[in-house]
Amino acid sequence: MEDFVRQCFNPMIVELAEKAMKEYGEDLKIETNKFAAICTHLEVCFMYSDFHFINEQGESIIVELDDPNALLKHRFEIIEGRDRTMAWTVVNSICNTTGAEKPKFLPDLYDYKENRFIEIGVTRREVHIYYLEKANKIKSEKTHIHIFSFTGEEMATKADYTLDEESRARIKTRLFTIRQEMASRGLWDSFVSPREAKKQLKKDLKSQEQCAGSPTKVSRRTSPALRILEPMWMDSNRTATLRASFLKCPKK
């Protein structure tokens, strides 16, 4: 699973996931499923934000190409992917600026158009079950919840899906692709079932040949979301690497 993750996700996403697991004292060599889940969640958060801006009139627009002459503001503030101290600093700044109620738990995004924090969920189970778990944990009507599944289902607070259908379809397609790629490598069952995960871990410890030697294909599309995070967690020497867009899983 670890090899699969490193080949199928952008290196910057992988690095963020590694830092997150290290921050919480988790070993990615053992918790490989969690490693994959964190990378998936990070990518969904970045895709959620990608290409969405607010123009001078305060309208939400989608721009896929950078226009240096356009006076645009990013619609979403990305909180996920930052270390806890910096994340809370961003949240406090947003609350002080917008008057938003400070959430009890760290959310994933802030939507400047709708003026609300957003909690993104990616589940391997039924969306309504995971939604209820999130809602019971957060216990706040102020934080908007949006859940995606690997089967193309989604659920959001008051059926308000925030994004346009095309943007959501892009996320669903990516999740479905990840599922298919995992299944083709015999990793999906262990990703879904803890019991199967233990069996897979034993296999992984015996052999690290899974996905080894496969060529990695790089899409040339730039991820604006990753660019937003650059000042917060990247140094200038790695800007070129940052600008590399999301990696696609190599075909068998």
UniProtKB/Swiss-Prot annotation:
Cleavable signal peptide: none
Record-annotated active site: 80, 108
Residues carrying the site annotation Important for efficient shutoff activity: 28, 65, 202-203, 206
Main location group: host cell
Xref: Gene3D superfamilies: Influenza RNA-dependent RNA polymerase subunit PA, endonuclease domain
Subcellular location: Host cytoplasm; Host nucleus
Protein keywords: Decay of host mRNAs by virus, Eukaryotic host gene expression shutoff by virus, Host cytoplasm, Host gene expression shutoff by virus, Host mRNA suppression by virus, Host nucleus, Host-virus interaction
GO annotation, biological process: viral RNA genome replication; viral translational frameshifting
Cross-referenced Pfam families: Flu_PA
Function (record text): Plays a major role in the shutoff of the host protein expression by cleaving mRNAs probably via an endonuclease activity. This host shutoff allows the virus to escape from the host antiviral response. Hijacks host RNA splicing machinery to selectively target host RNAs containing introns for destruction. This may explain the preferential degradation of RNAs that have undergone co- or post-transcriptional processing.
Protein name from the UniProt record: Protein PA-X
The gene coding this protein: PA
